[in-house]
Amino acid sequence: MIPVLPPLEALLDRLYVVALPMRVRFRGITTREVALIEGPAGWGEFGAFVEYQSAQACAWLASAIETAYCAPPPVRRDRVPINATVPAVAAAQVGEVLARFPGARTAKVKVAEPGQSLADDIERVNAVRELVPMVRVDANGGWGVAEAVAAAAALTADGPLEYLEQPCATVAELAELRRRVDVPIAADESIRKAEDPLAVVRAQAADIAVLKVAPLGGISALLDIAARIAVPVVVSSALDSAVGIAAGLTAAAALPELDHACGLGTGGLFEEDVAEPAAPVDGFLAVARTTPDPARLQALGAPPQRRQWWIDRVKACYSLLVPSFG
């Protein structure tokens, strides 16, 4: 938690905006823009997706400030198990994607991609099953209840799923689906985009909580929610750079219990990053703070007009944070 909000000028003075090229289209984008803030405790990442309005993005700025200005919490483990992340690629590309996650025994597969079919999803999931023993899928709220019931049956015809992540958009839909299928349900957007992140569990709509540092407002906020949510937690990336991944690893390492692989291996989705990506070893990532490489910051710097867009965004989000600090 940020005890005192630093001056806006201090944030802008140490702000770096970068554009990271991606290996494949993910979440509909091929370049990931983030703003990085250097502070007395290290580096923080402000990477709210560009379509988010300031009211939603300000939590991401709070997270960046916390990481840059506050000491990290004590950790309980020095490495974190990660899942491979498989975008909505053709089945023939699955082997190439999984090769970036050496030793991973769990894979998260994107499904319900606009413009694709359930048959595409089945083919992709089954290709992953041939290479990785544990599979989970993420629909990003792309199905209605009836579609999700049908998809759950089709996707488990050739093997089990660890869970369905955010198969439907609303808590009510998740609760209904959970009553109708045997596959465990994980909630992501229903937690990180909700005014009340605990509502999904009170509604008995999820078996697992997927928590992300930046959208929830920082490491301390994530740990607070994890302590109160009463279901197992998976810490995941919000398509973070190496700086954001380090914050996610710290949060996962600080949890009292960690029963599932975490979605923190997404650095492999970038062609270039602000620091040398940590390579998974036997399916684990080491817990460590990350300092960007100055040469990479310069080489990956966003164009002037995009840098100004992020500066304006920081100012707008900062103004929304000020009232919280009296």
UniProtKB/Swiss-Prot annotation:
Swiss-Prot/TrEMBL catalytic activity: (1R,6R)-6-hydroxy-2-succinyl-cyclohexa-2,4-diene-1-carboxylate = 2-succinylbenzoate + H2O
Signal sequence interval, chain numbering: none
CDD domains reported in the protein's UniProt record: OSBS
Residues bound to Mg(2+): D138, E165, D188
GO biological process: menaquinone biosynthetic process; peptide metabolic process
Needed cofactors: a divalent metal cation
Family matches, as InterPro entries: Enolase-like_C_sf, Enolase_C-like, Mandelate_racemase_C, OSB_synthase_MenC1
GO molecular function annotations of the record: magnesium ion binding; O-succinylbenzoate synthase activity; racemase and epimerase activity
Gene3D superfamilies: Enolase-like C-terminal domain
Pathway in which this enzyme or protein is active: Quinol/quinone metabolism; 1,4-dihydroxy-2-naphthoate biosynthesis; 1,4-dihydroxy-2-naphthoate from chorismate: step 4/7; Quinol/quinone metabolism; menaquinone biosynthesis
EC top class named in words: lyase
EC assignment: 4.2.1.113
Listed Pfam families: Enolase_like_N, MR_MLE_C
Residues at the active site: K110, K212
Keyword Oxidoreductase on entry: no
UniProt keyword terms in alphabetical order: Lyase, Magnesium, Menaquinone biosynthesis, Metal-binding
PANTHER family xrefs: O-SUCCINYLBENZOATE SYNTHASE, O-SUCCINYLBENZOATE SYNTHASE-RELATED
Note: Was identified as a high-confidence drug target.
Function comment: Converts 2-succinyl-6-hydroxy-2,4-cyclohexadiene-1-carboxylate (SHCHC) to 2-succinylbenzoate (OSB).
Assigned protein family: Belongs to the mandelate racemase/muconate lactonizing enzyme family. MenC type 1 subfamily.
Name by which UniProt lists this protein: o-succinylbenzoate synthase
Lineage: Bacteria, Bacillati, Actinomycetota, Actinomycetes, Mycobacteriales
Name of the gene this protein is made from: menC
